[in-house]
Amino acid sequence: MGTETKSNSYTGQISTSGGNPKVMKDSLSLVRQTVNQQTLSLSQSNQVQNQLNSHSNSNSYPNPSGSENKNENEQNSRDIRAKPEDKSRKEAIVPFVPIFVEEADVIQGAKELLKVIRPTWDLSHVEFKIRVVPQIEDRYPAQNAMVMMTLYSFTDGITNKLVGCFHKEISKLNDENGGSYLPIKTQGLSPVQSEDPVIIEKEDDDEFTDDRAADDGSPVQYSDNVVLVRIYGNKTDLLIDRKAETQNFLLLHTYGLAPSLYATFKNGLVYEYVPGTTLNTDSVLCPEIWPLVARRMAEMHRKVRKHGDSSATKPMPMIWKKTQSFLDLVPERFSDAEKHKRVKETFLPIGRLREEFNKLYEYLEALDSPIVFSHNDLLLGNVIYTQSLNTVNFIDYEYADYNFQAFDIGNHFAEMCGVDEVDYSRYPKREFQLQWLRVYLEEYLQRSNIQNDEVELLYVQVNQFALASHIFWTVWSLLQAEHSTIDFDYVGYAFLRYNEYLARKVEFLSLTAAKNNK
């Protein structure tokens, strides 16, 4: 199919070669010879600290900087793999491995990557856990199923594939929260070994986890024995700036807000795993958990600044530039005739959908919500709860960028309704939102005397920006419907988001900030 354009994620150097190279089984020497140890410059530690004391605008809320968090030391100890900052370190070096991992052969691709980034690992002692699409009952009838406990299924959202690589004894662990890793329908069967491993599907979407405490009460640490390999979905480069994603990964790591990035390859990342359990529509409402999410988001919004940014420069919000870009890419005619028919019968023409978004954006921009560095995709599967540490961490930074504060929160509230089984009756009620937002503001503004007026103002902004979230993911879903190879009904999901936008539009745009109302 012509030539493949290859862009190094760190230098922007471009080269071309014929075709898409497949993973070669005996490519270790080639890979090691061509690993490109490029560098991505990050701010020095003193520059980072200076950036913490600046705020990108002076909008609805006072500048949150200035007062130090009295629990800062405690919080740092709870951050992902938080370590003392090396004052002499100026650059983060991340290897680039020139491998393209085929979606149909992700295990072999993961093995080739491990040969480079974990050369001391004996691959015969490594077990893998990957995402598979078919349901377990469809492929392995219970009455004569023969399964092995080598490969397990879990998901990485609905656009990428994720492979967990577990070295030695890590594979023997059970999930304390969910019991055996064998699905309920196959429990009690004797595991068997086979030259061709059988892949079974886990019934939930939790990360591989083990929160158990050691004898001294500290959490069990297995990160060094686990590597996660993410393979990007088909044509997702149309939606996501992969160089920016890598920069975001490293940036957030310097703040203790992201795990270590071990390497990149042509169509993915290799990184440290985060122990814990992904949230679901029930746990996200638990009083032990939701305040952790609110504070973690506020911490990101308050602290993170890109190197070189200053209060004099107001960044372009992600929601504007990404939505416009996606609208440009949605095809006038879908290549799949059935999808095209469904889209045509369900949605406004793209030109009118753009007009609808532009009018909404003009209204939302006037709300003067602060522009902060945001995650922008806090669906429940991107929030990891570690019970033994009583912490949450966010994963997946594909859409992280500067954006309106209220969008990040409103988007998270909308995601509380689920993805695979969306139920918009789960959208958080007013009283819950007010509690959540008060906790958020305490962390964001670094003070406890939050006024009711401040909470009310943010409540209005958040719900009105939730409308923008619905349009954004509607357009995103239409684009995915054309290009993604993941087995997911993107047209159906777009329909759900767009209908919820229409259902809530008048209600949310009618909101006004009530004063002195708890």
Curated annotation (Swiss-Prot):
Keywords: ATP-binding, Cytoplasm, Kinase, Lipid biosynthesis, Lipid metabolism, Nucleotide-binding, Phospholipid biosynthesis, Phospholipid metabolism, Phosphoprotein, Transferase. Residues 1-88 are annotated as: Disordered. Pfam families: Choline_kinase (PF01633). The modification Phosphoserine is found at residues 190, 194. Signal peptide: none annotated. Residues 69-88 have a biased composition (Basic and acidic residues). Highly specific for ethanolamine phosphorylation. May be a rate-controlling step in phosphatidylethanolamine biosynthesis. Belongs to the choline/ethanolamine kinase family. This is Ethanolamine kinase. It comes from Drosophila melanogaster (Fruit fly). The gene is eas.
